[in-house]
Amino acid sequence: MESGSVANDSGPLNSTPDVHLYGKTAAMKQRRSNTMLFVFRLLTFSFSLAAVLVMGTNKQKIRSAPQYLEVAWHDFDPFRYVFAVNAIICVYSFVETWLAVYTLSRGTLLLPETFQVWFDYGHDQGFACLLFSANSVGIAMAQLLQSGSTLIQGQYYCSDAGAYCTQARVSIAMGFGAFLFLALSSFLTGLRVARWYLP
């Protein structure tokens, strides 16, 4: 009886991988999660880089000025804030994208699991809030300029500055796109943290 019991313990039933929800193995689910995180990281990087480039090149000539006069993105503090935060997110998401590629290619995390999971989750949360704050301030400034409540150089409207206001709003829209994918990344890293505390 004992030998039969041992034979059953080493039989096909115990060699079958542990199957979880929807019949996916734990390894398959983990790889799918890593792939999704890589896509979200890459999109966050792409949108934040686009926001930086569009805002950083936003310089227009004021056509109705009696002499040559330009308005640039750094003439308004909210637009500086948008540029700076998107630049930070761009660098952060580039590093995280590289880490995601490493995880996908090697099948393991570069850093100790506990440290990297909490590092990713904490920074995703903090940077997502920072990015939302910057874009909210930026869009408020863009609306004030568009409505004429705030004037460029104290006397010129958006229509006098070519595509200045439009380009600023495009940059902010790209920033909100980066926020969306950073928030989705934060959701996935949050699930990784939560799994440690779920029964």
From Swiss-Prot:
InterPro entries attached to this UniProt entry: CASP/CASPL, CASP_dom
Segments on the Extracellular face: 57-80, 146-169
Main subcellular location of this protein, as a coarse class: membrane
Self-association state and partner proteins as the record states: Homodimer and heterodimers.
Highest taxon, organism lineage: Eukaryota
Membrane topology: Multi-pass membrane protein
Family in the record: Belongs to the Casparian strip membrane proteins (CASP) family.
Protein name: CASP-like protein 4C1
Annotated Pfam families: CASP_dom
Cytoplasmic topological domain residue ranges: 1-35, 102-124, 191-199
PANTHER family, alphabetized: CASP-LIKE PROTEIN 4A4 (PTHR33573), CASP-LIKE PROTEIN 4C1 (PTHR33573:SF56)
